Curated annotation (Swiss-Prot):
Single biological process term from Gene Ontology: division septum assembly
Cysteines paired by S-S bonds: none
Domain (EngB-type G) ranges: 26-200
Family matches, as SUPFAM superfamilies: P-loop containing nucleoside triphosphate hydrolases
Gene source species: Ehrlichia chaffeensis (strain ATCC CRL-10679 / Arkansas)
Record keywords: Cell cycle, Cell division, GTP-binding, Magnesium, Metal-binding, Nucleotide-binding, Septation
Name listed for the protein in its UniProt record: Probable GTP-binding protein EngB
Binding site for Mg(2+): S41, T63
Recorded family membership: Belongs to the TRAFAC class TrmE-Era-EngA-EngB-Septin-like GTPase superfamily. EngB GTPase family.
One Pfam family it belongs to: MMR_HSR1
């Protein structure tokens, strides 16, 4: 199967809002996580080559559920997690979907890794490091992907990459991938890394 077609057939299956609604497809899952408004929906649309798959918004915290997308029938499931950080939702709603996300990450039998998005223009925030430390604590494998690199200079991009390389991390999966959903930069590399993870 050609690299460009691996993720091309994407079907939204369910938006889980509570633990009992979490599905079990019994096939590999890759979760996408990140701070609110980091560009998760745009990245999903870029790697599936369809702008309509995931709804995008300029307002942070719009995803209040865990969205499951079936990729190429039974190849894998792409899991869109709610953004952490600032949200216009009320505190009860925020707490509910963060608890749901935590439960999913700790209990999914099919999760292979988390793709953690970092806004390259903003850089690493304390809340990003808190989430990384949480993943490390629970021995959950993750891969870092920098987004919106078309909006920064290469020098700033290098600062972000070198920063994380200098941390003592045990469960990070390399390489760190730099992407732009708008310019399609790094998208094929990310698809390749996802495919390699599924094949292992």
């Amino acid at each position: 199967m050609k690299l460009k077609t691996i993720m091309s057939k994407c079907e939204f299956m369910i938006g889980a809002t509570h633990i009992k609604s979490l599905p079990d497809f019994s096939i590999p899952e890759i979760a996408i996580a990140g701070r609110s408004n980091v560009g998760k929906s745009s990245l999903i649309n870029a790697i599936t080559n369809n702008k309509k798959n995931a709804k995008t918004s300029s307002k942070p915290g719009c995803t209040k559920q865990i969205n499951f997308y079936l990729i190429n029938k039974d190849f894998m499931v792409l899991v869109d997690l709610p953004g952490y950080g600032y949200s216009k939702a009320d505190k009860t709603t925020i707490n509910n979907y963060l608890c749901l996300m935590e439960y999913y990450l700790l209990n999914s039998r099919n999760l292979l890794k988390v793709i953690l998005l970092i806004d390259a223009k903003v850089g690493f925030k304390e809340i990003d490091l808190d989430f990384i430390n949480w993943l490390e604590l629970h021995q959950i494998h993750y891969q870092l992907v920098l987004t919106k690199i078309d909006k920064i200079k290469k020098e700033m991009l290098d600062v972000n990459v070198n920063y994380i390389k200098n941390l003592n991390l045990d469960f990070i999966m390399y390489p760190i991938i730099s992407t732009s959903s708008q310019c399609k930069q790094g998208i094929e590399e990310l698809i390749y890394e996802i495919a390699q993870c599924i094949k292992k």
